[in-house]
Curated annotation (Swiss-Prot):
GO biological process: proteolysis
Protein name per Swiss-Prot or TrEMBL: Rhomboid-type serine protease 2
UniProt cross-references to Gene3D superfamilies, sorted A to Z: Rhomboid-like (1.20.1540.10)
Keyword Kinase assigned: no
Record: active site: 128, 182
Catalyses which reaction(s): Cleaves type-1 transmembrane domains using a catalytic dyad composed of serine and histidine that are contributed by different transmembrane domains
Biased composition range(s): Polar residues: 275-297
Length: 297
């Protein structure tokens, strides 16, 4: 029986989804259900202006885990899962978890500083900042190949600015949403794509491998037919090749966004060139990665 190409792609995508991208929606849903029963969960995790001055690390790190309503949760899950999944296939499962935490903190700190002076009584929660961070990240990545995008016959905009449109639309459609929080999340994603967060999101592979070793028993408990765990060893080549492709394209275009230069080095380019020669994966297309299916060695 003939199948439509779109259906085939969808069918392939759901056969072995990345481990974190599958587990995160489940985990967020469980947290939401618990928070409806135990209201202290939301009270303890929502981000407030005092989180920084009181050194409340639980709020600074975990505010994306709690949501106000079912609609809030479902809207974020639908938008978050595919973009995190694509990132995980390139960068590995454990490293993606590290990136999620770093993005939450990088967004929270400036929000707290601004809120002290401008909106001290506000509190924010939810994973929408993650969504805008990854939208910003992928917009920069895409702009290295397609600098501009035509939205209408007489309207052409820089590709890296496309998330701004979503930012404005969300602010209009959902006025109760945190425009500043979304904007700071978007800026964090731009910074990550340009390499300015590498010192935070690029821990040594030895650290990631150590974490993978510690959770290996948990990984093996999940049937291999359900998800794919993208191990650090397999992600090294795809990550280096993807970084090199972006840096090379940004170098050709000048790599300048709002006056900021892409933070790349010749070593990145050379490493990516070597990796691409050893990898059968084309990171500029499907970002499939070199995953380790759960339950296997």
């Amino acid at each position: 029986m003939a199948q439509f190409p779109l259906f085939q792609k969808f069918q392939k995508a759901i056969q072995h989804p990345p481990a974190l991208s599958l587990g995160l929606p489940i985990f967020l849903t469980v947290i939401f259900l618990l928070s409806q029963r135990y209201v202290w969960i939301e009270d303890d995790l929502e981000l407030r202006s005092t989180a920084l001055t009181n050194f409340e690390l639980n709020r600074i790190s975990f505010y994306p885990l709690v949501h106000a309503t079912w609609f809030h949760l479902l809207l974020n899950l639908v938008a978050l899962q595919p973009i995190v999944s694509q990132f995980e296939r390139v960068n590995g499962t454990v490293r993606t978890g590290i990136v999620l935490n770093i993005l939450a903190v990088v967004t929270a700190i400036p929000w707290c500083l601004l809120s002290i002076g401008f909106f001290p009584d506000e509190a924010v929660l939810g994973s929408s900042a993650w969504i805008f961070s990854f939208m910003g990240y992928w917009a920069i990545r895409e702009s290295s190949k397609q600098p501009t995008t035509q939205l209408a016959p007489n309207l052409v905009v820089p590709t890296w600015l496309l998330p701004i449109i979503y930012l404005v639309v969300i602010a209009i459609v959902i006025p109760s949403s945190s425009f500043i929080g979304h904007l700071l999340g978007l800026i964090a994603g731009w910074m990550m794509a340009l390499g300015y967060l590498d010192v935070l999101i690029e821990p040594s592979s030895k650290v990631v491998l150590w974490i993978e070793n510690k959770i290996s028993r948990v990984i093996d408990l999940i049937p291999s037919s359900i998800v794919t765990f993208y191990r650090e060893e397999g992600a090294l080549d795809t990550r280096a090749a993807a970084r090199a492709d972006t840096n090379r394209s940004l170098s050709v275009s000048g790599g300048n966004f709002l006056g900021f230069q892409a933070n790349s080095s010749q070593a990145d380019l050379e490493a990516g060139t070597r990796s691409r020669g050893n990898s059968s994966v084309d990171p500029t297309t499907s970002f499939p990665g070199t995953g380790q299916t759960l339950g296997t060695q």
